Each structure stands twice: as structure tokens, then as C-alpha cells.
């Protein structure tokens, strides 16, 4: 069947294909967060978005593909908002802002990450796209660290890939250990993160920061 015909079948009357896709992604984030990945049927997401199952499949080949697509969309939106809030912010300051928000975030992306990680352990259909997604996040973080090294914010002796892995592990851990399970004081958490980020600086810069304190 012609691809354009398939996409036209997946549209809501008076709504573009892009708007239908966005509606499906928002519905998926809400339904996955409410019912979990295993407890969610494709029909549940289609109904929440106000479309048919056929319309959903015109945009996404499977429930697993929809989960990861929702993750990518919400993740990009959060990052875009952070950059827009302060375009002149340094990379290490950006990492601190993201880090400070981790324990108290209530965004759909955090819920989607948890559902994706849990489902990936037992479902290969989820594991494959989740590996790709995590790889993309790690690559983005590593590029960010390389840019910080070029600006003498981060020690060139440190591995960007290792720092990216640490950041991912921190983000995934705080998504799993929510404030309801174990709260942490905002000021104490921020102080700890500040020390960690300061330790990433080149030795001369780090020594100057320590002397200033």
C-alpha cells in the first residue's frame, strides 16, 4: 500500500499527520505512566488519543516503538526548554541544573524511562529500541562533555564516555528512587552535585575553586 495513503488513513479529520502523531505521543506518555507498559494495550493509547487502532499503526509499528518515540520526544522537549531558559549558561551549569531537578521531577519522561527499563529486561522488542535510545542519550552527553573540555570546563584527562555513563546512571537511579521512596534535602543534594561537578574541572581550575571556598 502506498505510504502516503497509509498516513492519510491515520489522520483525524481536520488534523494534520504531525498533529495526530503528537496527540498519540502525549496519550502514550499518560497511559504508560498510569497503567505501566505491560498493562497498556495499543487500543488504550488509541482511545486516549481519540483515534482508531489503524490510525495508531499508521504512525507506529508497535507498542515498543511508541514507548521509545514518546521518550525521545519528551526528552528533546525538556532539553530544549532548558537551553531556551538560559542560552548563555555554561555546560557545567547546565549539568548542575539538570542534576538538581532529578530527585523532584514529575515529568512524563521520568515515568517513561522507568517503564522502558523494566520492560526491556524481559521483552526484546523493547530492549532493542531502548538500547538505541540510551546510546543516543549517552552520545549526546559525551558530545556535551567534549564541548566542555574544549572550553576548559572539564579536565581533558577524563573520559567523556565515562562521564556520560555516570550522568545516565544518576538520572536512571533517581527515576527509580523517587521522593516517595526516599526523599533528599534539596540544598544537601545541590551541594553534593556542586562538589562532583567541581571535581571534573581541570586541576588548576579545581584548586582555585577550592581556595575560593
Which positions does each model-derived feature cover?
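Hydrophobic/aromatic-rich alpha-helical bundle segments in the mid-to-C-terminal region
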Residues: 127-131, 135, 149-197, 204-213
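Hydrophobic alpha-helical connector segments
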Residues: 69, 79-110, 160-167, 190
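Helix-turn-helix
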Residues: 20-23, 27-65, 69
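Amphipathic alpha-helical segments used for helix-helix packing
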Residues: 105-128
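Hydrophobic/aromatic residues within well-ordered alpha-helical segments
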Residues: 63, 70, 74, 78, ...
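Solvent-exposed, amphipathic alpha-helical segments
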Residues: 23, 27-34, 81, 112, ...
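N-terminal intrinsically disordered/low-complexity leader segments
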Residues: 1-19, 26, 204-213
